[in-house]
């Protein structure tokens, strides 16, 4: 699930899901992981991260996305300080951090694989990373996709399978 509280959940998905400050603790009684999509848009305050760490058992895992400034604005270049800041902010989660997701824009294509390789090489080796690509060439079963997979293998990074071809089959309604 992409969040641990939702306005439609009380008395539905969780039979006795109250609106409260301990929603994460209640969520963690039913699920053992959560994707924190919000870190793509903004970074949480340190006190919130500490509260999250204290709200779940040791076997619970958080998955967070790298911030969009890292992935979309800088496209993985010249963002060492932002990466360090985000990883430092999540330090209170320690062993509860499951995966850091690297969601790349469709404009990040095969010509930028060397940038991805350098970025992954600079990350702490103990960090579990998953990469989501959206450029169509990475789904064409050709040399570009093979090259991407080789980069991921070399850096022990996972690949998120989000085949975007269906998103691009209809007309653009910008």
What are these regions (language model features)?
Residues 1-174:
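Residues lining hydrophobic/aromatic ligand-binding pockets adjacent to catalytic sites
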